[in-house]
Amino acid sequence: LKKFIEKISTTVPYTDDQIDIELHGKNLILTGSNGSGKTSLVDSIYKKLIDIVRSKKLDELKGWEKQKLHWIGQRYNAQEGSSKYQQAKQQIERLDREIDSVTSNPNITINDHLEFSRMVDSELGVIELFPAVRQSQIQDARSASGTNYNKGDLNNQRSGAQIGNQLEQHLVNLYTRRSFSITEHRNEELEQDITKWLSDFDDNLKFLMEDQSVHLNFDADNFKFYIKQDGKEPYTFQNLSSGYSSIFSVLSKLLMRSEYLKVSPSKLCGVAIIDEIDAHLHVTLQRKILPFLSESFPGIQYIVTTHSPFVLTSVSNAEIYDISRREQVGDLSSYSYESVLEGLFGVSSASDILQNKIREIAKKIEDENTSPGELETLINKLESNQDILDEESRFYLNSAKLKINKIKNGVGE
């Protein structure tokens, strides 16, 4: 499917600095220091997309500009202080606001905006903003119901925002429908389709929770789903950890949209904006979340913000822009997280305690009076953590070992 955003031109929030971000239809990862304006920027991108695509304001621009010229002429020919003059003045002010809503920052270059607008009208095209503070609100199911959902709910601002809350209800409906397809209707094809959907959902749970023992268990007496996992008490969608709740606030909404429309998730397109995509996530999940969403909903273009080097290095199909540096970085998927931490953020991947030990070893290596015993004591403090040392730390560790050998063998520096 076509990805629609080609370029974003804007001023950095709270500054006069103009920036141009080239997306070329790729995902966008925004990074930068706290207070650099990432959240303000993604908020403004979302509002602009709503204005120019969902509200069709881009289509109206030429008409507004023509109307403005008309009212400027009316004002010119009217006597100041007259009702005609006041009417013209008010119309010009109104049209200025409408024109400004399209032409003001950010300026978003869209590849085939009419096609994007058509897809949004059909509800296959999404324009979603998931704020930094997000938790899933998946509701309990009380009974089984049909799966012919009202597509009109997607157009309604209130009900459309809550479709993700119906995930457990949808699962109950699918289990019930599968049972009827076997016992009442003898519909083998339907039974296989539902079984595959549920199996795929189970596989997604295993992937996200990094545990092959994870599976859904349905309590048919209470219309309740439990997530079972070896070594843990069964738990529900209502008491997910904050990290998984953050993920499901995104996943359940997009998944339920495809179910409302009775299409594969791969048929959805548009733009999903996720502020602080790494919020509350363990580092292993930070590596997985953007690739997972990109593979689950491949037609959607993602714009995300993050501080995490694990997110920055997790995908190759993304442009990365550092707002603090006003710099487009490009693909970082081939870089280690240590090099990203130090190169992009200027932060060492080693802890303060480790850095102190390394500095001490470096001094001893340079000191001609250092004894093998002193170096061996320092090396022993590091070797238990050798597997997790960064490149610089491993270099000094090996240099210390080399110095010990030279001293013992009587070799000069």
Q: Where do the PLM segments sit?
A:
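Extended helical coiled-coil dimerization/tether regions that scaffold
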Residues: 2, 9, 100, 104, ...
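Switch/communication elements of ASCE P-loop NTPase nucleotide-binding domains
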Residues: 1-55, 224-350
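Conserved P-loop NTP-binding catalytic core
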Residues: 43-123
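Coupling/switch segment of ABC-type P-loop NTPase heads
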Residues: 73, 107-206
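RecA-like P-loop NTPase motor core
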Residues: 291, 295, 310-413
